[in-house]
Amino acid sequence: MSGNESKIYDYFSKNLISWQKNFGRHDLPWQKNISPYRVWISEIMLQQTQVKTVLPYFERFMEKYPTLKDLSKSDLDDILKIWTGLGYYRRAEYIHKTSKIIKEKHNSIFPENYEEMVQLPGIGRSTAGAIMSIAFKKKYPILDGNVKRVIKRFFAIHDNNGSDKKLWKFSENLVPKNNNDIYTQAIMDLGATLCTKKNPTCGECPVRLKCKSYKY
């Protein structure tokens, strides 16, 4: 990594962290009483689903299954009843399977190990990265749809050159040494609230001055 590249990455992460503290979302239910379990459920529910849709489902889910231990005692049919209307029902099946595995192997305590985490049903690299970063405050990247869009626009990566392998490398380099939990929430929030798919609010973006897609 060159000195100029390092400065760009540092600029990006520092500005996002500062923006998140002042303007990011802080009132989402999974941002309160943060735990690996709550982050995991929220990340699974948010896959291909908007926050406003997930909110009531997450609240109901936590009321019925406040802990991983409670969830591990559940039947799949009960989980599916709560999930009705949220769609992508395989996610509920993965949650059920994973809760049983964690109960059996880890006594219903979420594993603080990335390699073990990505072996669990329904937990891919990005979901594991979010859990490791937000819940365990470890230095791991994520690459969900919103983050991909932010990275592609900031570095002006066109679709034909935007392979996941390349984007993962950018994502890894952007994660700061400190405050990585705040940074992770920040880059997700930026993609969800300002750097949206349609009609992005570029004028309010905290990294617009070095964004290669920003139109002055």
Language-model segment annotations:
Residues 1-3:
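Charged, often flexible domain-edge or linker segments that flank or initiate folded functional domains
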Residues 6-9, 15-216:
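Catalytic cores of DNA base-excision repair glycosylases
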